[in-house]
Design a protein with these regions (language model features):
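Short glycine/proline-enriched coil/turn segments at helix->beta-strand junctions
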Residues: 24, 49-54, 105, 173, ...
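Divalent metal-coordination and catalytic microenvironments
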Residues: 4, 33, 48, 58-59, ...
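Hydrophobic "anchor" residues on beta-strands that sit immediately upstream
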Residues: 27-32, 54-55, 117, 177, ...
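Conserved beta-sheet core of the metallophosphoesterase superfamily
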Residues: 161-220
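Active-site environment of divalent metal-dependent phosphoester hydrolases
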Residues: 6-10, 36-39, 62-65, 125-127, ...
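His/acidic metal-ligating clusters that form di-metal
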Residues: 92-120, 125, 130-182
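Active-site neighborhood of divalent metal-dependent phosphoester bond hydrolases
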Residues: 41-109, 113-117, 141-150
Length: 224
């Protein structure tokens, strides 16, 4: 599991080399925000073609989709590291948008030890305080109605309430949930939610990866 890459795919490659990542046996999952701020955002197209690489959609992917569709705030996107997009030909922009629209908002993984792992970019989209993982999935897929779906989308992509409140409440119906979005100085756990964006978009940050079987982790610093 890798935190927000933000266009630093060479750094991700270095991390996988360090881990002796085997493309025949291993899989890598991403909490989203693969693009913007870093120098290799366009490489996302190549990475998403790899059969062993799986990602959820982050808010930066959503910003790209919105801007290309004509419903986004392009100046805001540029301020947040999206200038690279507008240097591309329109057909490449459309290809990127189409590819990113296909990314799921939630991924669920069954491990060999019968544990279930969830992945979402910002926060599990629980709408009501007693909701669990199943209710979050129902909300994001529209089974709980259009209003709940809109709220769930916003929560999944942008929310920071749990970490802002240092809420250690366990989300029922799932063993662990991995999220990014909120930058933390080191991999941080609140209840059964694990925050793994350690800020590789910033000069004093790092890219962190967690083995979801063993819960061991490595971080590669952005500073020399």
């Amino acid at each position: 599991m890798v935190g927000d890459v933000h266009g630093h795919f060479k750094l991700l490659t270095a991390a996988l080399d360090k881990l002796n990542f085997n493309t025949e046996l291993d899989r890598i999952f991403s909490v989203g925000d693969l693009i913007d701020r870093g120098p290799e955002s366009i490489d996302i197209l190549n990475w998403l073609e790899k059969p062993w690489f799986h990602a959820v959609r982050g808010n930066h992917e959503q910003m790209l989709i919105d801007c290309i569709s004509g419903h986004g705030d392009i100046p805001r996107h540029i301020r947040n590291g999206g200038a690279w997009l507008y240097e591309l030909q329109p057909d490449i922009q459309q290809e990127l948008s189409k590819t990113l629209q296909a990314l799921p908002l939630i991924i669920e993984i069954e491990l060999s030890n019968d544990h279930t792992i969830g992945i979402v970019h910002a926060e599990a989209p629980v709408i009501q305080s007693n909701d669990g993982w199943q209710e979050a999935k129902d909300a994001i897929t529209g089974k709980s109605g259009e209003q709940h779906q809109r709220q769930a989308l916003k929560t999944a992509l942008y929310a920071r309430e749990k970490i802002d409140q240092q809420d250690h409440t366990t989300i029922k119906g799932i063993d662990r949930i991995y999220v990014g979005h909120s930058t933390v100085p080191s991999v941080t756990r609140l209840g059964n939610v694990v925050y793994i964006d350690t800020g590789c978009a910033f000069s004093d940050g790092a890219l962190s990866l967690v083995d979801i079987q063993t819960e061991t982790m490595i971080s590669i610093s952005m500073s020399p």
